[in-house]
Amino acid sequence: MSVQYDAFSVEQTCADLETDMYNGLSSLQEITRRNKVHGDNDLKVEDEENMVVQFLKQFVKDPLILLLFASSAISVTLGNIDDAISIALAIVIVVTVGFVQEYRSEQSLKALNNLVPHYCNVIRSGKTEHIVASKLVPGDLVILQIGDRVPADLRIVEATELEIDESNLTGENSPRKKSSEAISSNISLTERNNIAFMGTLVRHGHGRGIVVATGSDTEFGRVFLTMQQTEKPKTPLQNSMDDLGKQLSLISLIGIAVIVLVGFFQGKNWLEMLTIGVSLAVAAIPEGLPIIVTVTLALGVLRMSKKRAIIRRLPSVETLGSVNVICSDKTGTLTMNHMTVTKIYTCGMLAAFSLPESEHIELSVRRTVGIEKALLAAALCNNSKVHNKADSILDTTCPWAGFPVDVALIECSERFGLKDPRETYSRISEVSFSSERKYMSVAVQYNSSKMNFMKGATEQVLSSCAYFSDQDGVQHELTAEMKENIQRNEFEMAASGLRIIAVASGINTNKLVFHGLFGINDPPRPQVRESVQYLMTGGVRVIMITGDSVVTAISIARSLGMAIPSNDEEAIRNYALTGAQLDDLDSSSLRDAVSRVVVFARTTPQHKMKIVEALQSLGDVVAMTGDGVNDAPALKLADIGIAMGRQGTDVAKEAADMILTDDSFATILSAVEEGKGIFNNIKNFITFQLSTSVAALSLIAISSVFGFQNPLNAMQILWINILMDGPPAQSLGVESVDEDVMMKPPRPRNAPIISVQLLQRVLLSAFIIVTVTIVVFRVQMQDGNVTARDTTMTFTCFVFFDMFNALACRSETKSVFKLGIFSNRMFNIAVGGSLIGQALVVYASPFQRIFQTEAIGLKDVLILLACTSSVLWVDEIRKWYRRRKGLVRTKSNYLLRNV
């Protein structure tokens, strides 16, 4: 436990854990030994229930299964041993299918927990490494930066303005200031200011800490058992499926009760009617619906992870299909976040000059004293550091690591042949950059004198300046005319899409010397333009939010294909809004603005909150991207919060619903497509299950009402249930995303799953199935007596209908011939397995006795195939008619329009 280290000094802590406060652990053998002793740095989940126990519980959890058991027992009492064995076998099969479904659902959900491994920065043998947090051991030296999640209990050994949010552990909302000073022992958790606790979040500053407890030995580990006992809430879709299941169950039970009563009054065998009634209840009630929904959602999430979009919460999958506004950061999401200085301006120049593309700039190329002063300020006001190339996780060839702007500036300094000045200038203090401040400043010591350096947005830097230096480094008073000249050059550079960074230095922080401007290029990501236009075609607005100047933002938005007019004045007036302008708007004006504005410039994370709230008040379903600590509230407020996997802080990732592992906007399009596709698949298998349920109930009901003998026996009905709830239904949930899915507008937030159109399709399919099946039954029963052959033909007819109906339900709008009949591998296996099972039921002697069937000829099979394929052909005609009438928007039409 970490409590003993409160009173230890830094030196005592290092001595006790045999580590070094600067170099960390140095022996790989010792790290391995400590890992064996203390185990991985994760929280162990309690042992799960034995699979055998889980399986046996299936027999008692469903009242209908218990009723079937009772029916089997009554059959034994009456001497009908064959019937009793048949029913018992059917129970085992039904329960096994249900168990496999639930087990698969649990395993799929479990796999989701492993999608987001957590990493941390650790110093070992004096070198910084980026490792999986679970591999930390006591004694490791961990680097903490703003936005990090603390990976273990740490004794702080170095802190610079370090503040940590401990609300998830202590309940206190205000971040706690941390220091390295030893404190008295036996104090409360909230007063332990030299310990950073596992799972808490760095809100401000930076520091280092030595691991003093890992895994279950941490303070967070002590409360983990309580967290384990909390059951995860179901998603809205799962709840609606539960409600739908209950409603259908009630309707089915009423219908079944009527069927059984009619049978009794007609003088049919009461035990047979009871068994058929219970079997119908098992078949008609879609108890597998919520499970298949869960499996479909979970497998869809796993599929998204392969496309670099990690969904952290299942309900988000449902929301993705409803998103109609995406608010995206510019840097790193719409652009590459690989920044390069391409232009430099210093006072006295007529215009900024462009840097050549060569790696090293010749000394003769404009190497003035003014540029050297600007480069010195940019390099000193900089937190980039040399990157450990052995670190494979960061996946970069750049020799520097840090914020992209810092890296661009230090690389520019290197290109001019300047050595890193931070080795000779000793930093005294730092004011970190934030999106609210829009600047960073440092105080340094050099030759016993103190100097201040500043970099940031031009307006912030200029407001702190009283002087400027010319190209020769000579200092002059900053006049209004020179300010205007600086701002004109900033505007011209920004108009070409460059991010502008101003630099200054001086002794007095309120009277700094302005040195110049750096124009930094951050090119758009590949495929972003196509993604933006594709989303807009599908009814999704794309809004760009950036801290850049409005001129830079407009230029970038236009290059990305957003709906921005070519005239800059009109674009700025009607399609762009700055953070300052946004603050001046009342709620009504803000709602009007967000309904038309495409670009928000010079914004802060607080502005993001206002934008989300205004859009939601208009009824929009909003996705918002973010990567910083202060973005977290907006990410939580948005319907879909999207964090960056590479550049994003742990705080942002904790608040987000989705994480982009490649930070690319194009990945959002893939996720929205997948979300819509998953919802389509859910509608398709609901259509399949409902049409089969309605057909089975209607078949028995019509037979009872018209006094026919039962066309299906209890065992056959249970077999149909296995097919309806089993592999064919599940295989519909993994159908590939339809390429036309983005042509459909976003789904309204509260739109019911069972629409009028879906219900019409269900009733049409059920009508065809029931009509043809009754015709087959009546044709076979010409002598008035029901034989094994009659029920076999009827039973096989219904099963074939199931298979063709499943094939038709693979897509609501697209022909199966365009999809490719064999394009869904799981569907092929499911249908193939079902047909093999049906062949065994009809032709294998042991199963013939159980299901009361007999072999039928090839001619019979061909006739049945011809009859049952009607459900597919009718659905194909329906799809063709909708396409012919232009009721279906397709991607091919979109591409033709844009040729």
Swiss-Prot record:
Primary location recorded for the protein, binned into one broad class: endoplasmic reticulum
Localization per record: Endoplasmic reticulum membrane
Keywords: ATP-binding, Calcium, Calcium transport, Endoplasmic reticulum, Ion transport, Manganese, Membrane, Nucleotide-binding, Phosphoprotein, Translocase, Transmembrane, Transmembrane helix, Transport
GO CC, any one term: endoplasmic reticulum membrane
Gene3D superfamilies tied to this protein: Calcium-transporting ATPase, cytoplasmic domain N, Calcium-transporting ATPase, cytoplasmic transduction domain A, Calcium-transporting ATPase, transmembrane domain, HAD superfamily/HAD-like
Membrane topology (UniProt): Multi-pass membrane protein
Segments traversing the membrane: 59-79, 80-100, 247-267, 282-302, 688-708, 757-777, 827-847, 854-874
Family matches, as PROSITE patterns: ATPASE_E1_E2 (PS00154)
EC number: 7.2.2.10
Phosphoserine carried by residues: 892
Active site (record annotation): 329 (4-aspartylphosphate intermediate)
Cysteines engaged in disulfide bonds, as pairs: none
Classification via SMART domains: Cation_ATPase_N
Tree of life domain: Eukaryota
Its job: Transports calcium and manganese ions into the cell. Regulates cell morphogenesis through control of manganese and calcium homeostasis.
Protein's name according to its UniProt entry: Calcium-transporting ATPase 1
Organism: Schizosaccharomyces pombe (strain 972 / ATCC 24843) (Fission yeast)
Taxonomic placement: Eukaryota, Fungi, Dikarya, Ascomycota, Taphrinomycotina
